[in-house]
Amino acid sequence: MADISTVQMAVTEIARYAGRMIELIESLPEDQLWSTGCGIPNSIGTLSRHLTGNLNHYFGAGILKNGYVRERDKEFTETGLSKAQVLSDLRDAVNVAKAAVEAIDEAQIDKPYRSPCGQEYESLAYHIVKLATHLALHVGQADYATRCV
């Protein structure tokens, strides 16, 4: 049985992994943000855009009901944004995730949860832990990709 501390720990991990993604982006020259290599089809810029959209969609639209509308296809096709913009957007998305956790009604944590795209989860806590692992996966890809660009 999960409680608010489980959710808070998951969001702490989200912030930690997002911090690692920010470090990776900051370490790249501007012209390498959108480069691919090592057989990874997505650039670090694209991975960051995807994570930004994911956090805004599930925490912003899903939990906060803030009206965010995800354009998932653009996360993979919209390239050429500046490094500063990509970093700013990712930082803002992490803040949305943190705000969402603060807004969660503790009584909802162990109840079944339907995501904004209609997927059913056994609980809101499980869904948030899943979001943390999704972020970790893509940050790992980005970490690997920095060695190839």
Regions found by a protein language model. Give the residues of each.
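Short, contiguous alpha-helical
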Residues: 11-15, 22, 30-74, 115-149
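Short, helix-capping/interhelical loops that line the mouth of catalytic, cofactor-
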Residues: 1-9, 53-103, 107-119, 148-149
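Hydrophobic alpha-helical core bundles mediating ligand binding, dimerization, or RNAP-core interactions
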Residues: 14, 18, 25, 90, ...
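Short, flexible helix-adjacent loops and helix caps
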Residues: 29-33, 106-109
